[in-house]
Every structure is written in structure tokens, then in C-alpha cells.
A protein has these predicted regions:
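Conserved nucleotide-binding/hydrolysis micro-motifs of P-loop NTPases
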Residues: 43-44, 115-118, 172-173
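Conserved coil-to-alpha-helix start sites within the AMP-binding
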Residues: 93-96, 117-118, 150
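Acidic, metal-coordinating catalytic cores used for nucleic-acid/nucleotide bond scission
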Residues: 90-92, 171-175
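A secondary-structure boundary/capping signal
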Residues: 41, 168-169
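Phosphate-binding active sites in nucleotide-utilizing proteins
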Residues: 6-101, 111
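Conserved beta-strand scaffold positions in the cores of enzyme catalytic domains, especially
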Residues: 38, 108, 164-166
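PAPS-dependent sulfotransferases, especially Golgi type II membrane carbohydrate sulfotransferases
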Residues: 1-12, 56-58, 62-83, 102, ...
Length: 246
């Protein structure tokens, strides 16, 4: 633990998981609350966690204090009235332990989706203009990246089981009203009926999920991969060989 020297008015909500797992939808729903600002996929934390800080800060407390001050000072620059700021960079799942140790007041929402559905969605999204998504260009590397994600999240979930808001996307879409109310409650906010009109929220969305967040919840998206099952054997074999059910 670190000594909290400076407090900030803005509190972060991290929404993370595999890309195409439903992070944009959950951000859209959460940010429809009047006290939540959806900032999109921020690169603040990955930049902070650049390897150079490991040479500069050898003392764990100094390192965590640096992460805290850098991150919170950056999100405090958003000139908005809302108390909570959503950071939906999916790859922040790499840093969950550092987040919870340096920013204990942060809320972390982890979204899990059917493995084959999320892997297929990564492949069909055509992330060719996104350097950070190079793994998504081949079926084999998508499967391998999923294994990395799965192992990391297994570790964090076991270590910080009481500190994560876990959402099963495929269950969420079946009863999104009840699920949304649970999320808002877990964040520590009061429910607002306007949240159910999340698809009318005209905030800027800069991901491949624009159409989804402007529409009502679609329940069958995780079944689409089955239409292409015979072409997806490389991913299926990787998942089966590592005892991952889909």
C-alpha cells in the first residue's frame, strides 16, 4: 500500500477485457449516467507503464505513487463536470494489479465474452491500421493472444477477486436492464432511468463498435462465429488444447 498524499476530484472507471468483448457497449451504458464521463480508449496508462519507469523507480512505493500521480493528474485535465471518468482501453487488463495498488479508489469492470465469439470478432474487424492489434491479422495469433489474456485474467481474478466487477457479456445481453442496474450499484452510483436509453447517447465513439452502441442490445452476436466454424479450426484447436470451453 502507498500513502495517499494527493486526492483528485476525478475517479477512474476502467473497462477492460479482450478487444471486441463488449467494452464499448458497457462504456456507453455507464457513461449515460449523469455523473460519468466516457473518455474512450485512453493511452495514458500504457504510456506510463513504459519500460523506462522500471529503471527510474526501483522502490515499489515510489513506483506506485508515480503511477497514481501521473494517471490521476492526466484525467483531471478533462474539463467536465462528472466525477467519474471511464477509460475503456481494453489492454489495461495487463495492469490491473498496478491500478488497484496505486489507485485503490478506482473501479475496474472486466468483461468476458464467449472465447470463439470474441476471437472471431477480432479477426473480422480488420484492425490493419492499428499497430497494437497486429495479433488480430492471423487466426493462430488471435488464439495465442487469447491464451495470454486468459492466463493474466485468471491470475488477477484469483488475486483480487473482491476488487473486480466481472461481467459475462453473453448473460448481460439477455437481461441488460437488471445487469446495468447491478453495474451502476457496484460503482457506487444511484440508478437513473435514462441509462436504459443508452443508444440515444450521442457521445463520440471512435471504435468499430459505433453501430452497436447506437442500437439497442443485440442478443445473438456471440453465435455468429458458428457460421464460419469450418474456417476457424486454428483458433478452436488452440482453445481446446488449453481446456478453454466455448
Amino acid at each position: 500500500k502507498i500513502k495517499i498524499q494527493n486526492t483528485y476530484k476525478k475517479k477512474p472507471i476502467f473497462i477492460l477485457g479482450m478487444p471486441r468483448s463488449g467494452t464499448s457497449l458497457i462504456e456507453q451504458i455507464v457513461s449515460t449516467h449523469s455523473n460519468v464521463y466516457g473518455a474512450g480508449e485512453l493511452t495514458i496508462l500504457p504510456k506510463i507503464m513504459h519500460k523506462s519507469i522500471w529503471d527510474k523507480y526501483t522502490n515499489p512505493e515510489e513506483l506506485l505513487t508515480f503511477i497514481r500521480e501521473e494517471y490521476l493528474s492526466k484525467i483531471s485535465e478533462f474539463n467536465v463536470n462528472q466525477e467519474f471518468v471511464v477509460d475503456k482501453m481494453p489492454f489495461n487488463f495487463f495492469y490491473i494489479g498496478f491500478i488497484l495498488k496505486s489507485i485503490p479508489e478506482a473501479k475496474i469492470i472486466h468483461i468476458h465474452r464467449n472465447p470463439m465469439a470474441v476471437c472471431w470478432s477480432n479477426f473480422k474487424a480488420n484492425f490493419f491500421d492499428n499497430v497494437g492489434m497486429n495479433y488480430a491479422h492471423k487466426l493462430e495469433t488471435i488464439g495465442e493472444f487469447y491464451l495470454i489474456y486468459n492466463e493474466i485474467m485468471k491470475f488477477w481474478s484469483e488475486t483480487y477477486s473482491d476488487s473486480l466487477i466481472n461481467i459475462d457479456y453473453d448473460k448481460f445481453v439477455i437481461d441488460y436492464e437488471t445487469s446495468s442496474k447491478n453495474i451502476i450499484s457496484d460503482i457506487g452510483l444511484n440508478w437513473e432511468n435514462e441509462i436504459l436509453k443508452f443508444h440515444e447517447n450521442n457521445r463520440v465513439v471512435e471504435t468499430n463498435s459505433l453501430l452497436q452502441v447506437r442500437s439497442k442490445v443485440y442478443q445473438d452476436s456471440s453465435k455468429n462465429w458458428k457460421k464460419y466454424k469450418k474456417h476457424l479450426s486454428p483458433i478452436m484447436e488452440i482453445l481446446k488444447n488449453n481446456n478453454i470451453e466455448f
